[in-house]
Amino acid sequence: MEEPEKIVSQTELDDKAQKLVEEKDADSRLRVYVGPMEKVLTAVLLIWAVFQVWANMFGTLGAVKLRTAHIMFLLPLAFTLYPTFKKERRRRRVMPVWDIALIAAAILSYGYLFMRYDAIARTGRLNSTDVWVGVVCLVVAFEAARRASGNLAIIALIFLSYFAVWGRYIPGTFGTSAFTLKRMIKALVWDTNGVLGTGAGVSATYIFVFVLFGAFLKYSGFSQFINDIALTLVGQTPGGPAKVAVIASALMGMINGSAIANVATTGTITIPLMKKTGYKKDFAAAVEAVASTGGQFTPPIMGAVGFVMAEFMCVSYTKVMLAAAIPAFLYYLSLLYSVHLEAKRLGLSGLSKENIPQAGKVLRERGHLLIPLVVLLALMFTGYTPLFAAIIAIFVTIPVSWVRKETRMDLETIVRATVEGSRSAIGVGISCIIIGVIIGSVNMTSLGLNFGNLILRVVGDGHLFLGGLMVMIMSIILGMGVPGVAAYVIVYVVAVPVLRGVGATEMAANMFCLIYACLSNITPPVAMSSYVAAGIADSNMTKTSLIAMKLGIAGFILPFFFLNNPVLLYGSTEGVAVSETIRTFATATIGVLAIAEGLSGLPMQKYSTGATALRLVTRVMLIA
């Protein structure tokens, strides 16, 4: 028998969530400045946002110079905001002296890079100054990464030391020749495969602009609109609060791109509401964790990781977005049905009518907030670039918010939205910069190719499911404790070649790695989303994670089926008839719903264990 729940205020819950997130997420441990330093920081964040929008709108800088200028803002801001150590006091009036020195080193070294890059690109020769400036560039980048995404910095250092120091001593497949310091610096700093590579490019363009767009949506009142719409749609159905959590977390998760932050933001409201309705605390925490995690691969924004995928695959973002649509829909449909079945099993009802806002009133008061999203999608589907579409959507958000007094963004709100957007782009930006080091290291040593060949020798050509199983395990392990964008890129480097080698299509291989890298957020032993949700709910972390894996079963199963049948990735396979897509979608829908039912506990009350297992196997076969 469970002990009675202690009544906790919303403020206490918010404080608790903040502490949990700070423990697992460096972005929540940012310094808070007071006095003149606060105004200076605000001004720099505003200037950075204006520069990024201007540079992406008019494109007067070349790609490399834009990336370098982006880093010249990014690193100093990281040293300003991220504490040197976890236990450091957050509230400050001035910066520590060592951070001022690091800021100077970052600006001078990357400023030198900005000025000298064209000359180096023409001649291909480095002098001693170029080499040592390159060393400083790497050192300051690693220090920023250590503060902002510690695990990622460690992984990058392992790759770097592998070919710089230890590679020559390793025999066989993973061995490599010796590299001089000059060659290493040229590859990782003075080339577009290192710190100035794809990661920096995506951070300086898509990620910054879409994070800024998400901040403007938030400050326009879009979050409240999502919550109210979810209440009107499913609030009165059995287990309504849990379904509201699923819908709200899905929509917010696709915008902010951080599963942990999403749990902390929406979970402090939805988890207590689910518990109050009658759900057990472990289940309530698991629902929030699963719903928040799926937002990272849910169109139209996909937490910015979709743009990285499009860049790597050299395809339009629209194609990636369409490919992700069916898997994301089935993931959330399965979760909603699981929540519904649990409510039925427990005999739970929905919220009373007086607690549900009227749909007409919600649409009248906040329906106009959908216009920026409609503009974004309309521009992308009519051929405009995602960058142009997002910038226009940002500018549209401001006048649209003026339609109603309740949502009106005044100058102060616009400034706050801009500052928060810039601040939110720092953590993921640092991850993207250091990802360049990982990619450059792997490319230089052929480690990814060698690793892929080793796995292919083990599984054999054409063994799609066996290769997929090995990549699934690898993706979950490499994705543990790493932000969504970084998790996908790390997995992409070593796993996509394996899947391509066993016969998967390019889109299927990339989507497979993305989904499993994201699902590491709910997979023990790390399961950071489950950890934060369990802390808010006062539930057992391991039990919460196991329930979360059961609730997110569609996410664990579907990737194997679109490896074999890429029709589930809409638009990724040419020559597929519409009727074939509809048939595959219909059978997959029936399959995931049937699996959710089989795992809900309801069939167990009527059938033996053997019969239930047989029913589950039959349902899995339906998806295929």
Label the predicted regions:
Residues 1-124, 131-135:
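Conserved, well-structured core domains of diverse proteins
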Residues 128-132, 193-206, 232-246, 277-283, ...:
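Membrane-interfacial loop-to-helix junctions in multi-pass transporters
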Residues 41-45, 67-81, 98-107, 131-140, ...:
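Hydrophobic mid-bilayer segments of alpha-helices in multi-pass membrane transport proteins
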Residues 143, 147-148, 158-173, 181-224, ...:
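Core transmembrane alpha-helical segments of multi-pass membrane transporters/permeases
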Residues 2-39, 322-424, 528-623:
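Long, contiguous bundles of hydrophobic transmembrane helices that form the permeation core
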